[in-house]
């Protein structure tokens, strides 16, 4: 199981590709990995902000790319897509930006 530091290092090393190919403006980890509560069965929750909003195909391509890159199932969420104020607040409290 990867640590949060290892995950951040991997994402940092691939920032250029994330920016150029997927138009990623910012990326942050939240959820169990951010709280150091992950288990072997945990996925990793990633909040992403784009320079240009991708179509669905590109969005799921990015999710698959990140899952393959990290070796962990990624649950990708677009910044601004969460409308429920309680969920939004909970996510914001966890955020670890890369």
From Swiss-Prot:
Cofactor(s) this protein requires = Mg(2+)
The residues listed in the UniProt record as binding Mg(2+) 2, with positions renumbered to this chain, are: 43, 45
The record ties this protein, via InterPro entries, to: NT_sf, Polymerase_NTP_transf_dom, Type-VII_TA_antitoxin
Q: Where is this motif: GSX(10)DXD motif?
A: 31-45
Q: Which UniProt keywords apply?
A: ATP-binding, Magnesium, Metal-binding, Nucleotide-binding, Nucleotidyltransferase, Toxin-antitoxin system, Transferase
EC code(s) of this entry: 2.7.7.108
A GO MF annotation of the entry reads: metal ion binding
List the catalytic activities from the record.
L-tyrosyl-[protein] + ATP = O-(5'-adenylyl)-L-tyrosyl-[protein] + diphosphate; O-(5'-adenylyl)-L-tyrosyl-[protein] + ATP = O-[5'-(adenylyl-(5'->3')-adenylyl)]-L-tyrosyl-[protein] + diphosphate
**Cofactor binding, per record:** Binds 2 Mg(2+) ions.
Which parts of the sequence bind Mg(2+) 1? 43, 45, 75
Quaternary structure, from the entry: Probably forms a complex with cognate toxin MJ0127.
The family annotation for this protein states: Belongs to the MntA antitoxin family.
- The protein here is known as Putative protein adenylyltransferase MJ0128
**Lineage of the source organism?**
Archaea, Methanobacteriati, Methanobacteriota, Methanomada group, Methanococci
């Amino acid at each position: 199981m990867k640590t949060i530091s290892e995950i951040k290092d991997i994402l940092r090393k691939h920032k250029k590709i994330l920016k150029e190919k997927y138009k990623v403006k910012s990326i942050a980890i939240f959820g169990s990995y951010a709280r150091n509560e992950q288990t072997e069965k945990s996925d990793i929750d990633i909040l992403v902000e784009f320079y240009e909003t991708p179509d669905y195909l590109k969005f799921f391509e990015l999710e698959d790319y990140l899952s393959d890159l990290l070796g962990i199932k990624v649950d990708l969420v677009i910044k601004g897509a969460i409308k429920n104020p309680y969920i939004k607040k909970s996510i914001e409290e966890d955020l670890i930006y890369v």
